[in-house]
Each structure stands twice: as structure tokens, then as C-alpha cells.
Amino acid sequence: RVRYTREADFLGKGTIVCVERTENKVPFHVVSRQGELSLQSDRLEVRVDLNTCALTYKDARTGKVLLYERQEMPREAEKTYMENVVYDPDSRRSEKTADGEKEVMDVLRRDTVGWTWKCRNHFRWSEGEALYGLGCHMEDFLDLRGKTMYLCQHNLKEMVPVLNSTAGYGLLFDAGCGMKFHDGPEAGFMEL
């Protein structure tokens, strides 16, 4: 499990997806090398670049790289303010949209009610690697390579924040929020 925050401590209560394990913890040892820290279990090795904090995941038995984060900026976070939008009930009207007739109202005011973080985790996938998952969508493709997906619960879409790779690993994004997946020519990211 990898966790990230820009705060001194993790905020909130988390989600119900990942729960702390109190038994059967995976034994591992730490190896310190020049500019790098390596956490090794019998099956997985996670290398941490001490300059950029970029992570590299390797199969401990074969040495094969499973996944690595973009070296120059593995993750980024931006503080975002949350608003409560108050609408003018006297402006209620119907408008025709692509989704059919919708009831709309004018915005009366926007109240700032708090803040949160918008985070991006940047990855570099292997050549020829296919990525599957992230739920049930209406698109006509399975492999997510080269695609952009906006992940949220919707009438015709179901979001499941799990990404599976033909390279032999899977990622669960335990964020409890809408997300954006993007894979471009240089690298990909998951935005939470």
C-alpha cells in the first residue's frame, strides 16, 4: 500500500476500501544504496529514488520492472477549494439539452465551504503493455492505452478504481472520489 499527502498527517477517516491489517503483515527488508532505498519482500521490490521520491516496482524473483513512476515528477498535488452553490429558485425553468429536458436555475451565490487536494500520480507503462479495468463503461474498447477516461458513477457507467496490467500487476486507487485516467505518448497519469 502506497499513501501520499502534502499535509503533515493524513486528513479525514479514509474510505472503506482499504482497511488496516493487524495480522499477516508482509515481511520485508530495507536496503540503502547511493540515492536509493529499496524495500524487498520475497515477491516484490519497491525502489524509492531519494531525490525525486519516484517509485519503481519490480518482481523480486525475476528482477523484471512491473511499473515505474515518471522520474522527473512522479506525483503532484494542488489545493482546491470546495463550494456550495446556492441557486435562485425564482429563476427555475426548463431547457432542452442533449440528455433531454432539464430543469435549471441561475446561480445566486457560491460559498466556499472547505478545501481538498487534487492529486496526480504519473506513470510510465512498458512498451506493449495493455491496461484494463476501471469499471463498466459504454466505450467500444477494452485496452485503456492511449485513452482518457473520466471515472464517476453515472446511469450508464460504473466506476471501479482498479487498473489491471498484462505486465502482471494491478492497482487499486482508494480515493473515494471521481477520477481521471489519461495515457498519452510520453506517460500516463491517474488524477484523484
Question: What feature does the model see in each segment?
Answer:
Residues 1-39, 75-78:
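A low-complexity, Ser/Thr/Gly/Pro-enriched, surface-exposed linker/loop concept
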